[in-house]
Structure formats: structure tokens, C-alpha cells
């Protein structure tokens, strides 16, 4: 009797009437573990039915309403419409450019200096930066250091001395002193 009362009260159209009223004559039966278990099972089944119905509805109608999407795009400003693909594509294009050539004043690849106080230092101007995809020594201002910490963005210090300056120096001792001062400056800037 108690079970039928629960069934009728739960399956009634009133959604708030989920649990049966605790009347004097059937309060003991309702509190028993058997009736509580039946009630819980019924409740779980109902929830599952609702979920299944919703899934079927989504499958039939389609999860995305095209009208809603259209309204959303119309509400956006023209500058914000579908820009991500273009940005990504431009970035890829920038990365896929060839390195700058010698005619443009840059080395075409990493070159290790083999003479003077700077022997063994790699000149990485013209190589591709792994962080930004740009050429070292081209885009950043001279004197700036790249965030990837791989290249110096100054021109090689040896390039500062033209033939005229080296002829004026004349004395070997003074020239070595100048080269040492450049080496100190170089090490303080780049290392």
C-alpha cells in the first residue's frame, strides 16, 4: 500500500510532489530502506529519460542553431569578425620567408669568427630566430638584444675598424690596447 502511494505521488503531474507526505499511518513504511530504494531508482530512471530525450532532440534539430550564430556574428564589430585565421596565416608566412642575403648587408647563416680577440664567437645576423621567426639584426634596433639569448644584434666589433682607422693607428701596441677595450665592451654587452 505504501509503495503504491509513493508511486502515485511521484508520478503525478505536480513536479514539486517528488516525495510523498509523511502521514501518521504510513510514515514508518516510507522511512524503511526498501521504499526509499524504490523511490531513488525511480528518480534516477526519470533523470535518465529526460537526458535521453534531450539527446534525441539535439540529434534531430542540431545542437547549433544557424540563426543564433548569424545574430551573434551580426552583433560583432566588423574588425572582430573571423580574424584569427588571417593572423595565424600571416605569422606562418613571416616564418617561411627566406633569410636575407649578403647584398642586404647580412650574413646568410651563422659564421664563426676565426681571427682576432673574437675567435670562436658566432655571428648570427641573418639567421632565423627560433623565438620570433625573424632575422637577427634586421628587425630589432641595433644595440637591442634578442629575447632568445642566442645572438648579438650589434654588428661584429671588428667591422668598426675601417682600413683608414687601422692605418692611422700605426703602432701595434696601441692597436692591441684598442682591441682589448673593444673585447671588454663586447663581453659586457653580450655575455
Curated annotation (Swiss-Prot):
GO cellular component: mitochondrion
Keyword entries, A-Z: Meiosis, Sporulation
GO biological process, any: ascospore formation
Induction, as annotated: Expressed during sporulation.
Function, in words: Not essential for sporulation.
Protein name: Sporulation-specific protein
The species this protein was found in: Saccharomyces cerevisiae (strain ATCC 204508 / S288c)
Amino acid at each position: 500500500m505504501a509503495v503504491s502511494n509513493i508511486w502515485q505521488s511521484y508520478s503525478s503531474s505536480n513536479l514539486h510532489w517528488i516525495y510523498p507526505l509523511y502521514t501518521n499511518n504510513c510514515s514508518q513504511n516510507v522511512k524503511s530502506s526498501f521504499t526509499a530504494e524504490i523511490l531513488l531508482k525511480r528518480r534516477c530512471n526519470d533523470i535518465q529519460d529526460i537526458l535521453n530525450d534531450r539527446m534525441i532532440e539535439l540529434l534531430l534539430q542540431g545542437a547549433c542553431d544557424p540563426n543564433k550564430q548569424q545574430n551573434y556574428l551580426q552583433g560583432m564589430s566588423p574588425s572582430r569578425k573571423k580574424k584569427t585565421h588571417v593572423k595565424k596565416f600571416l605569422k606562418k608566412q613571416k616564418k617561411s620567408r627566406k633569410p636575407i642575403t649578403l647584398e642586404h648587408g647580412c650574413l646568410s647563416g651563422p659564421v664563426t669568427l676565426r681571427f682576432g680577440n673574437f675567435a670562436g664567437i658566432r655571428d648570427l645576423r641573418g639567421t632565423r630566430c627560433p623565438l620570433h621567426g625573424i632575422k637577427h639584426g634586421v628587425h630589432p634596433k641595433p644595440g637591442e638584444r634578442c629575447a632568445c639569448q642566442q645572438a648579438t644584434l650589434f654588428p661584429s666589433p671588428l667591422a668598426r675598424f675601417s682600413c683608414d682607422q687601422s692605418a692611422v693607428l700605426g703602432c701595434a701596441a696601441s692597436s692591441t690596447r684598442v682591441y682589448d677595450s673593444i673585447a671588454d665592451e663586447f663581453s659586457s654587452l653580450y655575455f
